[in-house]
């Protein structure tokens, strides 16, 4: 299933939300963390107005998430400048994932720091991460990643590298803030470059900050237009 299709499976039920996470979105014995966060964000959009751009998303992975997903979302506080919301993925009444989102309109600032693309890739440049069934994590089949600069994963680098990496999604829907969340978490940890062979690894907490105002990025699980999303780390 495409990400937009999984998001489209999110339906209201018993004061919360439910969705189905298929096997092709697994990361080991749990659902891919980026998908968990994207579903949580989609649920938060049920209680947070779409015109408030996402600023920060903080995720804590408490326990493995499998199969049917149940989500509870609520507003913690709606202030003049920002709105804080919380979403919990639950299983049998127990929290498996906790996500806090901060939303707010932009403000003028005397300190401006615009993110810049430090590398303009050529069409055939860089190393493309292969998807190897049985070896690669299942969710990786939905993303195509090309390393443009920095040491390769498992190359035995002596220090964490500075990566420039291009990520595209196989989704046929328009790029939404939910897609950005998934793409951001699909990027491998920088520490992998310091290893000499594949090894288990998992995140306990994860934070995403939106450095630019993307108020036009609204979750739209039913759209079908072709889009390509890119991310640079």
Q: For each of these PLM feature ranges, what is it?
A:
Residues 1-233:
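Terminal targeting signals and extreme-terminal segments of soluble enzymes
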């Amino acid at each position: 299933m495409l990400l937009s299709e999984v998001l489209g499976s999110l339906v209201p039920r018993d004061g919360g939300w439910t969705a189905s996470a298929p096997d092709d979105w697994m990361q080991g014995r749990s659902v891919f963390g980026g998908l968990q966060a994207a579903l949580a964000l989609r649920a938060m959009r049920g209680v947070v107005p779409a015109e408030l751009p996402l600023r920060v998303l903080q995720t804590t992975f408490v326990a493995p998430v499998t199969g049917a997903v149940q989500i509870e979302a609520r507003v913690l506080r709606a202030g003049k400048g920002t709105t804080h919301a919380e979403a919990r993925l639950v299983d049998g009444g127990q929290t498996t994932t906790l996500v806090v989102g901060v939303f707010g309109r932009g403000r003028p600032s005397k300190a401006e720091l615009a993110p810049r693309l430090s590398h303009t890739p050529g069409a055939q440049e860089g190393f493309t991460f292969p998807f190897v069934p049985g070896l690669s994590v299942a969710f990786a089949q939905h993303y195509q990643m090309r390393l443009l600069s920095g040491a390769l994963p498992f190359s035995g680098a002596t220090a964490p590298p500075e990566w420039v990496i291009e990520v595209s999604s196989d989704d046929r829907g328009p790029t939404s803030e939910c897609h950005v969340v998934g793409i951001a978490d699909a990027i491998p940890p920088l520490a992998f470059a310091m290893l000499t062979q594949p090894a288990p690894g998992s995140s306990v907490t994860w934070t995403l900050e939106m450095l630019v105002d993307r108020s036009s990025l609204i979750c739209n699980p039913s759209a079908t237009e072709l889009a390509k999303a890119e991310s640079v780390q």
